[in-house]
Amino acid sequence: MPLTKYKAAAVTSEPCWFDLTAGVQKTIDFINEAGAAGCKLVAFPEVWIPGYPYWMWKVNYQQSLPLLKKYRENSLPIDSEEFRKIRRAARDNQIHVSLGFSEIDHATCYLTQTLIDPTGEVINHRRKIKPTHVEKLVYGDGAGDTFKSVTQTELGRLGQLNCWENMNPFLKALNVSEGEQIHIAAWPVYPGKETLNYPDPATNVAEPASDLVTPAYAIETGTWTLAPFQRLSKEGLKINTPEGIEPETDPSTYNGHARIYRPDGSLYAKPDKDFDGLMFVDIDLNECQLTKALADFSGHYMRPDLIRLLVDTRRKELVTEADPHGGITSYSTRQRLGLDVLLDSDVQKQKKSGASDLGATNALAY
């Protein structure tokens, strides 16, 4: 039986821009802080490591190149000692960690979310299915075996989505169908509505994300919904501005947008503009009971005989090979990245020391 009452936290803070090492350490610091506060769950924003590349919305191709190169150099591989440090922090604090980061795999970056359990194991590894608009400059698409979200945990059925995935009706329907109870709506860094210039639609500023999309997710799914958000400082504005361009001087429009909502869509918590840190919530899963009794879109309030969703979780390979028995060789992304190997197992230790044989190395290599 899952816990029905527990403490959780959502991060609203400034990332360590373009700095993988510092970003990993800041992540561990927040995990330690949440653990010391008695939290069972801590949730980080979208691509918290090494920060959301908001510059891609404001620069041309040539201006983007130095920033893009540095961003890729500081993105986080899954099968790395840096990521294992974060997993160990989850284990040390006996806490679930929902972590958003720029994952680099081969030569492609992905908008990745992982759910790490209190033993340090990765129980959900997902990639944003479609980067939004100019995000395609930086990131690739998730695959069939990396987009599902909802995971059964001791905290209940927990799901996580990135940014505008939270307003995708098909992903929302999929999560509802799997009985989601707690949702992480991970957001990047966004300017406020005062920056809006016609014809840019209001979809593209922070307030609709914080105050329309996120509570709509909560009320439509009947879930506790935590919305961690990144922040910006004056120094962060400078770091994210290409050379030769005058940086913005007022970061306040980017701050104060994190939220936590109850299962009925009512606001539980929002930060002050100058708040940087953890937002806490006392979750009671029984608050989902009446919201779902009124509108359970995966059960008594749906008509699957009339409306159904087709989901394909197969990975589509660029190259397929025949196996010795005449079938098609296939693999899962999870297996290729070594996520099926227990944290600090003998296989991982051998790999770290270089003592593993070639076959074991190839099985876990990128």
From Swiss-Prot:
UniProt-listed CDD domains: nitrilases_CHs (cd07564)
Gene Ontology MF terms in the entry: cyanide hydratase activity; nitrilase activity
EC number(s) from the headed UniProt entry: 4.2.1.66
Role this protein plays: Catalyzes the hydration of cyanide to formamide. Degradation of cyanide may be important for plant pathogenic fungi in infection of cyanogenic plants. Can also transform some nitriles like 2-cyanopyridine and fumaronitrile.
UniProtKB keywords: Hydrolase, Lyase
GO biological process, one term: cyanide catabolic process
Name of the protein in question: Cyanide hydratase
Superkingdom as given in the UniProt entry: Eukaryota
Positions annotated as active site in the UniProt record: E46, K128, C163
Keyword Lyase found: yes
Any single Pfam family the record assigns to this protein: CN_hydrolase
Domain CN hydrolase as annotated: residue spans: 6-285
